[in-house]
Amino acid sequence: LYVSAMSVKNKGGSDGDSSNARMSVRTGRECFKSLTTAEAVTLVSLPEKVRVSLPAGNKVTADMVQTDDAFWHIFRFRFLSGKAFTKADSDAGVPCAVLSAAVARRLFGTTDVAGKTVQLNYVEYRISGVVADVSVLATSAYAQVWIPYTSTDIARLAWWEETVGQMRAVILARSAADFPAIREEAEQLRRKYNDSLRDSEVFYRGQPDEQFANLYRKWSETPDTKAIILRYMLVIAILLLVPAINLSSMTLSRMRRRMAEIG
């Protein structure tokens, strides 16, 4: 399940008079990391460009996301060297990073670099591990560098009573049968969180989403998944129908020629 964005409004205001944004670390922790009905919950920032370099050595620009240890439980990666940063690393804000194979090779010429040090925008980070490259089509997991968000000041980049920030939440259920319970608990946590706010309240516009709905969600627009599926079915039907019509026409044309030959 996914919560890619949220809305915030003045307490008691209408949903139409609201702003849409990513959630803050505080909102993510209190409203989603606290879920007990889910197997795991991770907070993930959007990819940002970062300068990855060696002191007086090679450098490369890469896409970096900030996340936590639960990310490595929810998404499966193939480690070529080392391992993911741990819960202890994440809780303590240890400056450690996981690199993609492409970035490791550009910098070191090899992927066997766990334990070595790189600079991310001139800040030193220890390399925990190296993973096989991730396709940009894997939008929820893609990056070239992953670091704990506790190792930066991203938690302080929050506004509107610290509800809005730069994070999104990904929730792993034990099974699809748990989706209703997870959504119900998320709503309970949302109401509890709003009670703690003085002037604001947050809401999710139908989220958490399943994967298909998440792909088509655009900020405040709740995707009409039934209409999207019908549209795809129509396109597929047309793609299948056109060759069938062409084949029928060819068969009919040949039959007419044969009939003419027979007399």
Where are these regions (language model features)?
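Structured, solvent-exposed hinge/loop segments at the ends of secondary-structure elements
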Residues: 1-107, 111, 119-125
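Membrane-helix interface segments
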Residues: 58, 178, 226-230, 258-259
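Mid-to-C-terminal secondary-structure elements
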Residues: 65, 69-84, 95-223
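N-terminal membrane-entry
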Residues: 220-237
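Faces of alpha-helical transmembrane segments in polytopic inner-membrane proteins
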Residues: 238-245
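Intracellular coupling helices
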Residues: 245-263
